[in-house]
């Protein structure tokens, strides 16, 4: 599904789901978009089958859950291998996300959570054992997200 195929109703659905997918009913979204409940359900199904909506997940406060450390590990992998390494990196205990970067020398950003340094060190070692270079480690104090504003039909776009 190309961007030009996403209309204002799709954008409003995406915005609403980013706000609160767990509690946002198709009826709630229908009221926002001036469409029917069945239209919203069909649109959501289409967005899912087109893999624009890749899934639904909980926004976990790791600190409240007893894992106060969130580290960003900037890594360098060989360009031909970096994409193929992502599933293996995600299998490392403590890794919660991997991003493939396209500019700069560091081309993978690995996010790790843990209770203490002793949880983070084995992750860094596993990355080294895979042949990656860990170029930088950054401790994150807080992490907040917001729905993408261009999906909000009320912002004038």
Region locations from a protein language model:
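A compositional/biophysical signature of low hydrophobicity enriched in polar/charged and small residues
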Residues: 1-157
């Amino acid at each position: 599904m190309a961007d030009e195929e996403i209309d204002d109703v799709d954008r409003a659905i995406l915005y609403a789901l980013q706000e609160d997918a767990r509690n946002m009913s198709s009826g709630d979204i229908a009221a926002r978009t001036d469409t029917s409940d069945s239209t919203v359900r069909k649109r959501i199904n289409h967005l899912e089958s087109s893999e624009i909506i890749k899934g639904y997940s909980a926004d976990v406060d790791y600190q409240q859950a007893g894992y106060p450390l969130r580290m960003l590990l900037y890594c360098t992998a060989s360009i031909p291998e970096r994409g193929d390494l992502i599933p293996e990196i995600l299998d490392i205990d403590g890794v919660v996300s991997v991003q493939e970067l396209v500019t700069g020398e560091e081309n993978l950003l690995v996010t790790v959570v843990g209770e203490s340094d002793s949880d983070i060190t084995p992750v860094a070692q596993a990355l080294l054992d895979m042949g990656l270079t860990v170029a930088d480690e950054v401790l994150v104090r807080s992490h907040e997200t917001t729905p993408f504003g261009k999906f909000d039909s009320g912002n004038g776009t």
